[in-house]
């Protein structure tokens, strides 16, 4: 991840774009790029989307990468260790969604019995 972050920083800095990359603008960009990813699957069934993703891996990969690049940069400029944040969130989610209550169901944790 460190090498990827260094490449993202270099790409940005070589173009003097750091001035535009604040938390608000990066959050907006994440949302826009996520919408572009979502648009690829618009109006498809789950089965169609799975097939499309397999058949159009490069296109899907590019949109995922766009989201990830902005997300990694947002974590960087806000001083958030992304790997650590993910680990902490997984631990929190494990408590919200215990296996014995959530296995095989898509119910939100507030409605699990």
Language-model regions: role of each:
Residues 1-64, 68-113:
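Flexible "arm" and connector segments at domain edges
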């Amino acid at each position: 991840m460190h090498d990827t972050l260094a490449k993202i920083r270099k790409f940005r800095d070589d173009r003097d774009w750091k001035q535009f990359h604040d938390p608000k603008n990066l959050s907006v960009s994440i949302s826009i790029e996520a919408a572009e990813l979502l648009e690829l699957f618009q109006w498809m069934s789950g089965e169609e989307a799975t097939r499309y993703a397999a058949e159009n891996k490069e296109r899907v990969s590019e949109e995922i990468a766009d989201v990830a690049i902005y997300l990694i940069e947002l974590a960087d400029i806000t001083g958030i260790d992304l790997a650590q944040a993910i680990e902490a969130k997984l631990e929190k989610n494990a408590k919200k969604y215990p296996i014995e209550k959530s296995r095989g169901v898509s119910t939100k944790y507030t409605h699990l019995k």
